[in-house]
UniProtKB/Swiss-Prot annotation:
Domain Rab-GAP TBC: from-to ranges: 78-256
Pfam families: RabGAP-TBC
InterPro entries: Rab-GAP-TBC_dom, Rab-GAP_TBC_sf, Rab_GAP_TBC_domain
Name this polypeptide is given: Growth hormone-regulated TBC protein 6
Gene encoding the protein: tbc-6
A GO molecular-function descriptor: GTPase activator activity
Source superkingdom: Eukaryota
Region forming the signal peptide: none
Length: 330
């Protein structure tokens, strides 16, 4: 899986000879990447560059922060890297304000965190240093300390890594991590009740927006938690290209959970023919895994626009969640 990123900076300032991008991830033209990935990236890059340069000019010219509806539209069309930290932290409280209490962290949780530190984006230029890994460990410890019902769950290490790389401020990055995980804490913990509930919700949405996929799921008797549970646990990190993840998170942080469902449904719709043609569980799992490297996943601007057009809102999600809670066992 490629996790390359792209930032809207002037063409002349891009170092094409560098093997890593601004977040420290390997570029597709690195010798360690496959040539097919490089060609796919270059085609996307040439179409995406004018979009992000244009969006940055619009952000600098119009200042969308002055109007919530205008800001929503601008966020959906992409937050320039220079403004991303500011927008992500816009509504994030500080731990210094006493919003979260501290709890004792079990030794077993600390052990699990330590085991996953070197496994977190091991090829990333910045996260593989000892100092940054310690920072990552402190961030994950803070989640366990402030949200004991979560403790630590595999996948949160990747979420924390992305936040640290983007925010580039340990204290505020930890604030944001704890804040975002607290909003989705039922995805984690022993019974993962929130994840099971939202897989039920996603199934209902797929039945409405791409019923052919649901027919295949039911024919093969496969649950969405096995297929795409990781999407929701990791908020699509390690499942989609990094620029796509960042664009999704822009919307997720500003608008809420509806964007997890919007993206999931849009990805299934874009790959509906291949998925609905599957005749076995193994074939289905392969097709779902291939979604992350599909053209639909790479062309993030088009994916966001298609997702925004879906009739999925936080209000409709809450209604479906209420129904799902009655249907799933405790």
């Amino acid at each position: 899986m490629y996790v390359f990123n792209f930032y809207p900076i002037p063409r002349k300032s891009i170092n094409f000879r560098s093997d890593v991008d601004d977040l420290g991830f390997l570029r597709p033209w690195s010798p360690q990447e496959e040539s097919g990935c490089k060609k796919q990236y270059e085609a996307w890059y040439s179409s995406y560059l004018p979009i992000v340069v244009r969006r940055r000019c619009r952000w600098e010219k119009e200042n969308p922060r002055r109007n919530s509806h205008l800001l929503q539209r601008f966020v959906r069309k992409g937050i320039p890297h220079t403004f991303r930290k500011e927008l992500w932290l816009r509504s994030c409280p500080s731990r210094a304000d006493g919003v979260w209490q501290r709890h004792e962290v079990p030794d077993e949780v600390i052990k699990q965190i330590k085991l996953d530190l070197p496994r977190t984006f091991p090829d990333n230029k910045f996260l593989k240093t000892e100092g940054t890994r310690k920072t990552l460990g402190r961030a994950l410890f803070a989640v366990a300390e402030h949200i004991p019902s979560v403790g630590y769950c595999q996948g949160l290490n990747f979420v924390a890594g992305v936040i640290l790389l983007v925010v580039n401020d340990e204290s505020r990055a930890i604030d944001l991590l704890v804040h975002l995980v607290s909003q989705r804490q039922e995805y984690y913990g022993k019974n993962m009740i929130g994840l099971r509930r939202d897989m039920h919700v996603l199934h209902s949405l797929l039945r409405e927006h791409c019923p052919r996929v649901v027919v295949t799921l039911e024919k093969l008797d496969v649950g969405l938690d096995m297929l795409v549970g990781k999407w929701f646990v990791c908020w699509f990190v390690e499942s989609l290209p990094m620029e796509t993840v960042l664009r999704l998170w822009d919307c997720l942080i500003y608008e809420g959970d509806e964007w997890l469902f919007r993206i999931a449904v849009a990805l299934f719709r874009s790959n509906m023919i291949a998925i609905s043609s599957c005749e076995s569980i193994d074939q289905l799992m392969t097709e779902v895994q291939n979604i992350g490297t599909s053209k639909a996943a790479l062309y993030c601007h088009q994916l966001i626009l298609k997702s925004a057009a879906l009739s999925i809102t936080n209000k409709s999600i809450e209604a479906l969640r209420a129904d799902a809670e009655l249907a799933i066992p405790e």
